[in-house]
């Protein structure tokens, strides 16, 4: 077992790992984010206005909104389940940078889908979500749609860097600092652990 219920009915991590809901959501959301980025990058394989390009952009949006929905569940799991300590304890500045990185990633997973929803709303386009059509957040305003789209694209590039730095930091902690940062979120337990 990766986690156990305490007397208050909340899940608490074993002393050296996050709880299983948090671990599952971390890796599942990574797969979703990879799919979101893949969809938007692969759209260039088809001409503008073509059905395949529109379909892959629709998937980009729907998967992005899925990230938005799941990030709230993930935050709840993290708050209720707690955060196991990093052993050995890193320097205070590393802890601060880690907190800032996590805050930036959560902000990205919340703001980017909302920006996508605003873009489609302002462009006057349908807002699909797996068979549903969501209401627009703002009225039609093509200039606003273009402005938000520029911000969305820039933030998407920043997202690549944030995700890459997050992965690099976890590998640095594991292979250079030899602490349990990576293993706290690993799908597999160390043998004998």
Give names to the regions the model predicted.
Residues 2-193:
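Membrane-embedded alpha-helical bundles that constitute the cytochrome b-like, heme-associated redox core
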């Amino acid at each position: 077992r990766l986690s156990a219920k305490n007397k208050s009915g909340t899940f608490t991590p074993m002393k050296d790992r996050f709880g299983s809901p948090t671990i599952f959501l971390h890796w599942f959301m990574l797969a979703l984010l990879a799919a979101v980025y893949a969809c938007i990058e692969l759209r260039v394989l088809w001409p503008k206005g073509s059905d395949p390009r529109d379909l892959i952009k629709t998937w980009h949006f729907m998967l992005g909104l899925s990230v938005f929905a799941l990030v709230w569940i993930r935050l709840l799991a993290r708050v209720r389940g707690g955060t196991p300590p990093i052993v050995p304890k890193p320097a205070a500045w590393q802890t601060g940078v880690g907190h800032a990185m996590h805050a930036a990633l959560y902000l990205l997973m919340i703001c980017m889908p909302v920006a996508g929803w605003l873009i489609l709303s302002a462009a006057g386009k349908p807002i699909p979500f797996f068979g549903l059509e969501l209401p627009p957040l703002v009225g039609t305003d093509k200039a606003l749609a273009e402005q938000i789209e520029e911000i969305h694209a820039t933030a998407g590039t920043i997202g690549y860097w944030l995700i890459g730095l997050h992965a690099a930091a976890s590998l640095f902690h594991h292979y250079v600092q030899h602490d349990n940062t990576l293993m706290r979120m690993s799908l597999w337990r160390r043998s004998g652990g």
